[in-house]
């Protein structure tokens, strides 16, 4: 778990402005207090400022006033955000009256702050469903140019450090896209490469997984992975990426030497792209429960700016870590833009 400490160190070295739309929620407040005390990020907490301060006092938190406390119903940029939302959504039939209501929704307000350049990223989901977090993000922040789908990646820290990157594997998509097309699967692979560099600080070696290795089985499901591999290589020819590969061929060098001897990643993959959400979700939970791996995520990828969705069962520590991860995504995005 030294990687988590490295993620926190990088965040502290270049503090990013992260928005917490659920600013009055207890776990969120506790995580915010720790983040502010340690200087990991700069924060905006959305909610009634008096309610935030009162709750923080009840919880014995002493750093919340270091955050920007933003009342969604009354702040100096409200009209500017209404105008921005109208510019973005007028063609979809949004009226000024509707926009005025939406900008008071903390999830919309957080995304508008990002779009306006007033914040670098958002973290929500402790008390909101994934769909409610993603909807304003897709409408306002939108996806990365050249990427049409959002996906979710997990960092899996295995007790056995012979796999992946000293025991670190990245799994995608385990959270968002139920049955991606070949093109969407390729986009997930390219987005995952960006995440590997931005969050894990590793050079990705990507395996496109299937139940077949290099033509060992014939099926339309295999064809999808083969096509996704071709598209991903066209999108990002510099990537170390190969498919289709079975899991053992992707991770075990002895198996790789037999099944895919000419593959640039077989036997040493550190990023695993699953063909469906069903496979990815089951896969990460199997490794978590049966192999004793620690799963950190999902981290959303494919957005034009970082917006992350928490599990509603997230702990204070989960929120703390995800805020630092969100900051790392922002740092990497800014570096890429120059």
Predicted regions and their residues:
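Anion-binding alpha/beta catalytic cores of soluble intermediary-metabolism enzymes, centered on
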Residues: 1-266, 271-338
